[in-house]
Amino acid sequence: MVDAGFVNVAKYIIKKTPIGHLGKSLENLRSVVGEEVMDQTDVKKEIHNYGETHLSAVNNNVTNSKVVISPLTKDSEGFYHDQGQKVKFKIGLASGEVEEAQATDIQNDLRNVIEQKVKEYLEKCYKMEVTRYNVYYDQDANKIVVLISVHNLNLKSFWSGEWLSTWELDISGKGVKGTLRANTYYYEEGNIQFNLDTKFDGSADGGDDAEVAANLVEFIKTSENSVQLELEKVYDELSEKYIKPLRRKLPVTGTKMNWNINQLNLAQQ
């Protein structure tokens, strides 16, 4: 019988793993708690949820493209939607791969205009090699969801980070609700994590679809820029007020360096 405590430990570690490190965490967990624990349905669900939480981009083999997944782009039957490619699919719990891909004809003119505006914004302001997005028309809730996912990894230099934003436009009232999460992880001779989660409310009200789309993307841009500016202030403050005082006042030997050049004549040695 599988120890429930080991299952809970595995789930917790998976949930807390920084972006870019899940593969190594799973490898370590298998060696510690064993394959039987990792094969439990609850553990596999946690791995699946990790992908949704971090707005991961999965490979859609049908369209040969990558699409961001989220609970917000999943319908009541468990299909994730990539309306830009007119396809929906499920992800196997065991395999983690795209399964049961089907064509879909759910389209919305406003969604299409928003997708084009979002693409233009991202191409201008983001590094597209690490950026993925998805624009989804939720027919049942009468809303449009915009997902922006950036996973920026430099494991050789001991850091990884992600910038995840979710925006929901109510089609009827044109109200906008947004959530932005930024997580960074530095682990060279230490373990420093920074996690930010902030919310926004606004409006994209306008005349035609083009104006609504432009207003929505402008709201996204303004909101994201405000977070970026605040982060720059935070990092400056951390460096000056908190990081510098932690640095060693003396070298490891406990002896101050003599910087008098007259006493450092190497020619006499």
What is the meaning of each model-derived region?
Residues 160-164, 196, 200, 254:
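Generic preference for flexible, low-structure residues
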Residues 150-162, 217-222, 261-264:
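Short, Lys/Arg-enriched charge-dense amphipathic segments
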Residues 189-236:
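Short secondary-structure boundary motifs at beta->alpha junctions and helix caps
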